[in-house]
Amino acid sequence: VGCRNQERNYCSRVCCGHAVKNALKLKEKNPDVDIYILFRDMRTYGFREDFYREASDKHVKFIRYEPEEKPVVKAVVAEGKPVLRVTVPDAILGQTLEIDADYLSLAAAVVPSESTREIAGHFKVTLNPDDFFKEAHVKLRPVDFAAGGVFLCGTAHYPKHIPETISQAYG
């Protein structure tokens, strides 16, 4: 939620993978639980693609929707209990589905901190078009800023997983 749109055209890289991984953890605790993952464009980077396959094998239901037809959520009472009714057009089935959910979890975009511009000004470092900190040179100096003595690592640079952050920290 909140990326790969006009406001933020980048992929947060961690949202889809964590949604799938959390679905697997829920299935581990209760194999009979119904889990739906609604997505516009599933992107499970690296070995996280294995999580996607495993989740599919464990009957996690993946529903793709088009950006023009986003899911709608309403609080309703069904069978005497409050639920969240999620209405989503299924692009593959060509029909609109209604899912009554007890819980709803959003995989939110990784966005730069509101103080990023202020920090960039203090350290005299540059930002990329998405307002993440920009390295001096993507190939030759990937953890350096143009300003000397200041180094770059982790999601301040761009959305990334922890192993990528650790690798970047080693320089």
Feature locations, PLM:
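Residues forming the flavin
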Residues: 1-171
